[in-house]
Amino acid sequence: MNQEYLDFELPIAELEAKIEALRAASDDKVDLTDEIKRLQKKSNELTKKTFANLDAWQVSRMARHPNRPYTLDYIEHIFTEFEELAGDRAFADDKAIVGGLARLDGRPVMVIGHQKGRSVKEKVQRNFGMPAPEGYRKALRLMEMAERFKLPIITFIDTPGAYPGIGAEERGQAEAIARNLREMAQLTVPVICTVIGEGGSGGALAIGVGDKVNMLQYSTYSVISPEGCASILWKSAEKASTAAEVMGLTASRLKELNLIDSIMQEPLGGAHRNYAKIAENLKLRLKEDLAELDELSKEELLNRRYERLMSYGYC
């Protein structure tokens, strides 16, 4: 996969291009090792400096980075024996939601998540990660299956929002989301949710009601996109950077408000720089969360989840 850079990363991109050019030019007659090491050190220092002070708008753009790992990437790196399950048994199979049975270090679990595409064809097939009602009904079907077989549920959240098309509304988009919220609140098995990219409004919440809610360092969680907020408040999407700052959509701000449990640190430069490392960190977090939740009885699990939901909105 070709590495892509955002505009605030362009100085880093220039250094990386120079490093690649030197590597290509290096041969037995010309040893450029020292110069390459010097530039690599300079690139690392510049990357640390750049990412030490990202604002909310820059974090929003990182959450949408085209190279960022998606749900299926995490499934590949974290789980074994993944068996995808399809369809809502009522209308269709929504490719914007993926899910199925898998093993986490040998333990059977149910994994569900939003899935975006990378190529134009994949993006269209996955509807840009925006599920229709049948996607949320598929997710609910898998959750109910997990409860019947007493399997923990692990969800990965990464969507700009639920699909707002006419067909989706006619098929009951709002009802599908609302039903998921109600049913997830009553599940008697552990539910762990992780925001890996964009956490867009009800489209994210529909698989986001859990006993543990974690976020990656450069992910976002909000009721609307910065562009949408800016269009409503200032009648211009160009105010998106201002909107991002006041919306409090970053992981650090949401942790301050006690809306999430933990923040997963990403590799230097973002999760897309090192899939294996971020997957390793996330796997450890999932195992720790499961171990904690396993100690609770069904009643304690439900009571804690209820108290968690009722605490939202209180300072």
From Swiss-Prot:
It is found in: Cytoplasm. Pathway: Lipid metabolism; malonyl-CoA biosynthesis; malonyl-CoA from acetyl-CoA: step 1/1. One of its GO terms (molecular function) is acetyl-CoA carboxylase activity. The keyword Protein biosynthesis does not apply. Its EC number is 2.1.3.15. It is an enzyme of class 2 (transferase). It catalyses: N(6)-carboxybiotinyl-L-lysyl-[protein] + acetyl-CoA = N(6)-biotinyl-L-lysyl-[protein] + malonyl-CoA. PROSITE patterns: COA_CT_CTER. The keyword ATP-binding applies. GO terms for cellular component: acetyl-CoA carboxylase complex. One of its GO terms (biological process) is fatty acid biosynthetic process. Keywords: ATP-binding, Cytoplasm, Fatty acid biosynthesis, Fatty acid metabolism, Lipid biosynthesis, Lipid metabolism, Nucleotide-binding, Transferase. Residues 38-292 form the CoA carboxyltransferase C-terminal domain. It holds the Pfam family ACCA. Belongs to the AccA family. Component of the acetyl coenzyme A carboxylase (ACC) complex. First, biotin carboxylase catalyzes the carboxylation of biotin on its carrier protein (BCCP) and then the CO(2) group is transferred by the carboxyltransferase to acetyl-CoA to form malonyl-CoA. Acetyl-CoA carboxylase is a heterohexamer composed of biotin carboxyl carrier protein (AccB), biotin carboxylase (AccC) and two subunits each of ACCase subunit alpha (AccA) and ACCase subunit beta (AccD). This is Acetyl-coenzyme A carboxylase carboxyl transferase subunit alpha. The gene is accA.
